[in-house]
Amino acid sequence: MRKIISKALSQETKNELHKLEARWANFRFGNPSKKIRVIGVTGTKGKTTVCNMIASVLDAAGKKNAMETTINTKIDQEYTAHTNKSRWVTTPPPEVLQGFLNKAVQAGCEYAILEVTSQALDQNRVHGIKFDTVVFTNLSHDHLDYHKTKENYLLAKLKLFENNPKARFVINEDDANWNRFYSLPASEKFLYSVKKPIEHGAVARKILSSPNGSTFTAAFDDGQAIVELKLPGIFNVQNALAAFCVGLALGLDPEKIKLGLENVSLVAGRMESIRVSKNQDFAVIVDYAHNPDSLKNVYETVREGMKNTGGKLISVLGATGRRDKTKRPIMGALAGYYADLVIFTNEDPYDEDPSSIIEEVAEGIFKGAVKKRQWVLNRNYWKVLDRAQAIHKAIKEAGKNDVVLITGKGAEEVMAVDIDKFVPFSDRDVVKSELIARFGREG
């Protein structure tokens, strides 16, 4: 009945109902955001990693904190992984969200860190929450199935800043939209960049990247710190700068900020390398990249790490059903440009025909083709409907110094095969099984 009523209502009406729900939840739990300092992180990509980095920085500084992200919930030192895709909403409904904040308060946490999506902002899910610090990471092609235009998408992100004029702002100056956020009133504004000097915030200099991580100098108003990240890729340097600026905004010791960033290990399903045996002579990486910009960043990071190895990049990818269809051929084109072998496969089709989704992604491969490579079906690219079989095919094709890159699902442990139907599926588990079958288990 609730679904029938929901379909009959306009989005505007539903948003007003969400606002009422948020007010009630806020009242029920005693307005918890006034008893804890809330940090909100929004942007197309990097939100989960930035949240985990901020939590690590606060831990290093001895500040009790809680966190709610796509992949995990944290209350002080107790972590809970999110494995059910029906639970995998970046920003939960108001009742759940206010309950989480209340638990954080009851646990004695001083800070709470929240991932905040554009949909959550548009739908008033965070209405009534008082944010102490808000972060903008970036804006790129995604979620146009919901917002229709990139301007609407941007306007939704801006709400987090517009609604919190007394908060501290942390903004990525390398993003083309940075000034739309910076122009809004705030108690204090911090910028970060890997490209240009900034007036107040942090900039990365002397960046050295490898497949195992990145080292850079974070230069800020009162000094500098050499940070050795365990996470690879320039995009993770940007993520680290965002967390560094949050630490500065909160008045933390820069040495504690540095320590917290250096303590961050790979986030599950984010550039996660899987190895089962010392005999394994190629790499397998699982990553959540599910939009063009994230996919491009991952491809570039992997390619950078493969320089002079002579190995092939074998890409396994698809696209989610019921989401922005315009990005599907773009992702296929990126695969055509960066990869040597490509396997297009199923990825959370919901109620769409998975074969049709695969066709829409695969048609882009020719647009991304480089002159030295001609794409031929069943010779250097394949369409494999069964995702487990696609992973099997990729690992079978892999040889010495190759990299198998599996994108789209990250650490998720279910696949959405209809609107409300989820079946168990884990890229990571399938990869481990395939590698054990080929190399045996170490130990």
Q: Positions of the model-derived regions?
A:
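A general structural signal for well-ordered alpha-helical segments in protein cores
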Residues: 21, 51, 178, 213, ...
